[in-house]
């Protein structure tokens, strides 16, 4: 009572001293005054507040000072929340008394109060005083929106808005009833979401509430709550008006309810970033796939940052309240500047439909004086654990009915969880709490069965592996092994050197280059390189050795020469280790040959090949190479580097140590001295400086392989032997061995700046005496990529990139070289397209992988030149080559006019296919028929330049059917065809008489319906592998304009009618 009297006295004194109090702020937070002052200041700066309003704001601050002098806070409501003595109502009565004494000369605009119930009380008095109330907390007025016209609300939330949003969500999910869950107690602002929502629905009857569950957080039996919820509707609507939201959600069990296929909906009166921002609450909601209905606050984080400029210590749960206070004070100015003064009717009219723009965004009033609020339905984004909008509903003003002056316009932003409507409803046992969860039992059974299956698979694989070990697949029988000694090796070597010296064409020299072998082995029909020892006694291999040799036999890699096996324990008393023979040359020969231009392309490709093969070995069960030298790096015919003699050095050392074998006395040194000093010091054995005995086999290890890689890379970069000992095979230098072992001696590296210096520094790291400090293969690969950035991939890839590089360089040259550039580009693409079909070549060039595939129907044709061997005997090689080039070029010209592809030419045979890789919808048979007729016409008129009397005769056969095709080969890819259709077409050609085009009856019938082709029935022909086949000859294409003469025909005996040619009889 004393408080009310003080307020009356203070207001009366201010009335006598000042022009009047216009703005009264109800709030119990000290920062509210700053926010309100900020709003008035911003409105003034934006020209939305009158000079009189500014004076009134200053008068408000004066009243605040007077209140403080009397020991009374400037906020009329002194209580926290909405409990205790109702001071707001007391203050309202006091102000009413002052207003009565001043006979209406004192006008008021009320902002607030915090309690929603008190807004109704203040609003009722304001109706009498004709003073407007700007509320910033949501109010549900059961009497209707037109019954409280003195209240203008900026709360940006309404019970009707969330109710209509819920109705729309229910329609989308095809639900007609809900279970409503809320707190018995109200929120600090006096709002009870669940009670107001139920009251609204009782009036509007928008949906059916099957169960209404009120929860008293201080005294609750959660078991009963759980049973009541499960007996209710499938859609459970939880109003988040709890003091401890996490505990309430956890005890309600929203995650388990979601597991029972209930639909969880959470309703908030503020944005989720403010109420549900705790990580544990987010995790709980994400696990339940809950929908969250709340007001939509655009750019929440930006607005929060702006508010922190006014209130530095702003808490997460205070933002919306202060934002509403700001909007209320700002609206006070906007109403005043529009001439509304402080009269209720004028203020209400001025603000209806008004759009107000502030630094926090724009808000618009409807016709009832309430702010139009947009709503959203959120879910939890699992990737970032943030709130993601899946549905927004925009409020649009409309003519007011009893409770709403707006309608919602929905917009779906995601279809993430709308599939919930297709899920089955909860089981009946859920409501009875009688469900039995069999999932743990099923999981346990699955785990046990899986363990048993895995154990069985492991046991079977181990047993099968053990059986394979004892099959001795690596053992080469002596009967299939034959050693071939090349007695003319020295003479061949001399001729090879002379050819290299005399051949100035580097490309031709590289193509023709071959190794000269003193001897080699034949394993069956396959040639192999070998290392042979004299066997002293029979060797008993333990199981570990058998397993090792079996694993060695199973190795398969593009950069490894195949390990054939070992011949051992035979009566010839030798042990022979065999690998695939690679003919072109060793890396050592190429490195030391100064005439060979080893540019960055070759270096990078060979280095990568070495590391790829070595990486495969290190990751396999073999684990090492052991004999890695430039001489054991072999270059094959396709310029692919392959490693040989891998994984056997430790095996050979063990047998030598056990004296089971020995090096033959007359055999050449297995390891030359220049190779010996390039092995890692930790594996070098003592060397016989007398030179009478060859070095022992050196053991190997993965770290030792890295040391040898450094030596090989040094040789490739410097193009010389690391220790300049290439001619020191006969007399070793024992001093050098001791320097390497004891003085850390290593190859000399100059200080000259070069691009490859980084690689040489990496070589020095490879030679570190501590094996653990040597670089890894991955690091070596990275160094190669750094040193040779433009050389990547294998040689085929690099050749393509080199062509593109050269093309780019040529384009920048002067006009005189433009023609050369175009020619180089044309030749590059022509060569590529000769190897592969154009579409396949293009895809491979773009780095795509071309998997093999099958074609339902395609046509394959073979053309063979008759009497080719006789022609070769009476012609020189140059004349034969010129003839083949000439005739095949004419054939190629025919192919280019049709949808077909030349697969390959082999001697006198020419192979064509249509329908692959480009499927032409059945046109392939007609394309090949046309090609065959045109090629035969060429043969009729062809004149051989060096033999004018020679008559060219050809055999043509084709067949249509299913086919398989794919790119074979990685280093030298070719597009190959497979299948019975290819074999059948080949048989048609081989069984065909000269100057005829032969096909089977099955293929001929594909051309019958066109009525454009004339066939002759040959009859039954015995075809190898096919049996008796009814064959036809294709004679001509019946064109409309003219009919070309029939080709000459060679009578062939027919099994059905001898000496006759039977016209085709269509079925």
From Swiss-Prot:
Glycans are attached at residue 411. One of its GO terms (cellular component) is non-motile cilium. Residues 21-438 are extracellular. Disruption phenotype: AWB sensory neurons show an expanded fan phenotype caused by membrane expansion. Increase in trafficking and localization of tub-1 to AWB neuron cilia. Increase in PPK-1 and PI(4,5)P2 at the AWB cilia membrane. RNAi-mediated knockdown in AWB and AWC sensory neurons results in a defective preference between different food odors. Gene3D superfamilies: Nucleotide cyclase, Transferase(Phosphotransferase) domain 1. It is a single-pass type I membrane protein. It catalyses: GTP = 3',5'-cyclic GMP + diphosphate. Keywords: ATP-binding, Cell membrane, Cell projection, cGMP biosynthesis, Chemotaxis, Glycoprotein, GTP-binding, Lyase, Membrane, Nucleotide-binding, Olfaction, Receptor, Sensory transduction, Signal, Transmembrane, Transmembrane helix. GO terms for molecular function: ATP binding; GTP binding; guanylate cyclase activity; peptide receptor activity; protein kinase activity. Residues 1-20 form the signal peptide. Its EC number is 4.6.1.2. One of its GO terms (biological process) is positive chemotaxis. Expressed predominantly in AWC but also in AWB, ASI, ASJ and ASK sensory neurons and in I1 interneuron. It is found in: Cell membrane; Cell projection, Cilium. Belongs to the adenylyl cyclase class-4/guanylyl cyclase family. Guanylate cyclase involved in the production of the second messenger cGMP. Regulates chemotaxis responses toward volatile odorants in AWC sensory neurons and their avoidance in AWB sensory neurons. May be involved in sensitivity to quinine by regulating egl-4 activity through the production of cGMP. Involved in phototransduction in ASJ neurons downstream of G protein coupled-photoreceptor lite-1. Required to maintain the expression of putative olfactory receptor str-2 in AWC neurons in adults. This is Receptor-type guanylate cyclase gcy-10. The gene is odr-1.
């Amino acid at each position: 009572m004393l408080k009310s009297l003080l307020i009356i006295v203070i207001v009366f004194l201010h009335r006598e001293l000042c022009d009047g109090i216009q703005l009264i702020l109800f709030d119990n937070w000290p920062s509210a005054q700053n926010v309100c002052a900020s709003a008035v200041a911003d409105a003034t700066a934006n020209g939305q507040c009158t000079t009189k309003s500014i004076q009134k704001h200053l008068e408000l601050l004066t009243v605040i000072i007077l209140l403080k002098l009397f020991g009374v806070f400037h906020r009329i409501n002194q209580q926290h929340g909405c409990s205790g003595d109702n001071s707001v109502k007391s203050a309202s009565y006091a102000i009413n008394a002052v207003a009565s004494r001043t006979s209406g000369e004192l006008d008021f605009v009320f902002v607030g109060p915090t309690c929603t119930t008190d807004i109704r009380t203040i609003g009722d008095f304001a109706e009498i005083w004709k003073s407007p109330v700007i509320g910033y907390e949501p109010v549900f007025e059961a009497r209707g929106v037109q019954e409280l016209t003195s209240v203008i609300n900026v709360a940006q939330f309404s019970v009707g808005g969330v109710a209509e949003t819920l109705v729309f969500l229910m329609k989308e999910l095809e639900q007609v009833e809900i279970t409503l869950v809320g707190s018995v107690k109200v929120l600090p602002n006096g709002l009870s979401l669940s009670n107001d929502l139920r009251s609204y629905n009782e009036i509007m009857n928008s949906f059916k509430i099957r169960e209404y569950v009120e929860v008293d957080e201080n005294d609750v039996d959660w078991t009963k709550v759980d049973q009541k919820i499960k007996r209710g509707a499938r859609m459970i609507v939880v109003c988040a008006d709890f003091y401890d939201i996490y505990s309430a959600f956890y005890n309600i069990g929203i995650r388990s309810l979601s597991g029972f296929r209930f639909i969880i909906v959470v309703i908030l009166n503020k944005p989720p970033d403010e109420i549900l921002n705790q990580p544990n609450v987010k995790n709980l909601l994400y696990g339940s796939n809950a929908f969250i209905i709340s007001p939509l606050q655009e750019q929440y984080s930006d607005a929060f940052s702006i508010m922190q400029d006014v209130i530095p210590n702003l808490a997460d749960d205070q933002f919306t309240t202060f934002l509403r206070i700001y909007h209320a004070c700002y609206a006070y100015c906007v109403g005043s500047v529009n001439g509304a003064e402080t009269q209720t009717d004028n203020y209400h009219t001025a603000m209806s439909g008004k759009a107000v723009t502030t630094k926090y965004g724009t808000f618009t009033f409807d016709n009832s004086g309430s702010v139009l609020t947009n709503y959203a339905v959120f879910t939890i984004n699992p990737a970032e654990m943030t709130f993601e909008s899946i549905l927004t509903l925009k409020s649009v003003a409309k003519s007011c009915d009893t409770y709403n002056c707006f309608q919602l316009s929905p917009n779906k932003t995601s279809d993430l969880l709308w599939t919930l409507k297709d899920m089955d409803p909860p089981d009946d046992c859920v409501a009875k709490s009688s469900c039995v969860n069999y999932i743990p039992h099923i999981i346990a059974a699955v785990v046990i069965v899986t363990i048993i299956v895995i154990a069985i698979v492991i046991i079977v694989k181990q047993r099968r592996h053990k059986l394979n070990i004892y099959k001795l697949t690596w053992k080469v029988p002596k009967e299939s092994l034959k050693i071939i000694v090349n007695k003319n090796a020295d003479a061949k070597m001399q001729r090879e050197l002379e050819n290299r010296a005399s051949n100035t064409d580097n490309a031709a020299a590289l193509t023709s280059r071959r190794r000269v072998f003193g001897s080699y082995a034949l394993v069956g029909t396959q040639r192999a390189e070998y290392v042979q020892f004299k066997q002293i006694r029979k060797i008993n291999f333990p199981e570990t050795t058998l397993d090792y040799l079996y694993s060695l036999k199973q190795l398969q890699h593009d950069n490894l020469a195949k390990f054939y096996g070992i011949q051992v324990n035979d009566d010839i008393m030798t042990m022979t280790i065999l690998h695939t023979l690679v003919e072109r040359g060793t890396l050592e020969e190429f490195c030391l040959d100064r005439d060979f231009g080893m540019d960055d392309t070759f270096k990078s490709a060979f280095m990568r090949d070495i590391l790829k093969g070595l990486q495969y070995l290190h990751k396999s069960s073999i684990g090492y190479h052991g004999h890695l030298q430039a001489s054991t790096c072999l270059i094959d015919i396709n310029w692919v580097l392959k490693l040989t003699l891998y994984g056997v050095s430790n095996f050979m050392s063990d047998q030598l140590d056990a004296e089971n074998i020995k090096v033959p006395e007359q055999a050449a040194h297995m390891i030359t001295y220049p190779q010996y000093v390039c092995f890692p010091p930790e594996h070098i054995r003592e060397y016989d400086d007398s030179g009478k005995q060859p070095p022992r086999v050196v053991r190997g290890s993965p770290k030792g392989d890295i040391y040898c890689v450094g030596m090989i890379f040094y040789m490739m970069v410097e193009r010389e032997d690391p220790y300049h000992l290439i001619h020191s095979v006969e007399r070793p230098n024992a001093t050098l061995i001791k320097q390497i072992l004891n003085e850390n001696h290593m190859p000399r590296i100059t200080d000259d700046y070069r691009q490859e210096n980084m690689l040489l520094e990496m070589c020095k790291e490879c030679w570190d005496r501590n094996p653990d400090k040597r670089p890894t293969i991955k690091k070596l690969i990275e160094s190669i990529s750094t040193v040779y950035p433009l050389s990547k991939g294998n040689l085929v890839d690099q050749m393509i990139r080199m062509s593109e590089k050269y093309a780019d360089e040529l384009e920048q040259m002067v006009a005189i070289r433009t023609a050369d550039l175009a020619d180089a580009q044309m030749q590059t693409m022509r060569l590529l397209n000769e190897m592969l079909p154009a579409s396949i070549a293009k895809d491979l060039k773009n780095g795509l992988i071309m998997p093999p595939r099958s074609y339902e129907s395609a046509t394959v044709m073979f053309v063979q030149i008759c009497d080719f061997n006789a022609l070769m005997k009476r012609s020189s090689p140059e004349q034969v080559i010129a003839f083949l080039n000439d005739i095949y070029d004419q054939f190629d010209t025919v192919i280019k006019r049709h949808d077909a592809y030349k697969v390959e030419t082999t001697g006198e045979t020419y192979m064509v296919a249509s329908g692959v890789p480009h499927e032409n919808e059945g046109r392939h048979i007609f394309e090949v028929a046309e090609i065959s007729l045109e090629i035969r016409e060429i043969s009729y008129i062809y004149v051989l330049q060096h033999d004018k009397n020679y008559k060219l005769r050809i055999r043509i056969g084709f067949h249509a059917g299913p086919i398989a095709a794919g790119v074979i080969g990685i280093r030298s890819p070719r597009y190959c065809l497979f299948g019975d259709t290819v074999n059948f077409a080949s048989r048609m050609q081989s069984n065909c008489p000269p100057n005829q085009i032969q096909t089977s009856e099955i293929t001929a019938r594909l051309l019958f319906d066109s009525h454009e082709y004339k066939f002759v029935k040959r009859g039954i022909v015995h075809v190898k592998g096919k049996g008796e086949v009814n064959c036809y000859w294709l004679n001509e294409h019946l064109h409309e304009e003219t009919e070309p003469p029939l080709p000459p025909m060679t009578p062939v005996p027919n099994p059905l009618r001898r000496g006759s040619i039977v016209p085709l009889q269509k079925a």
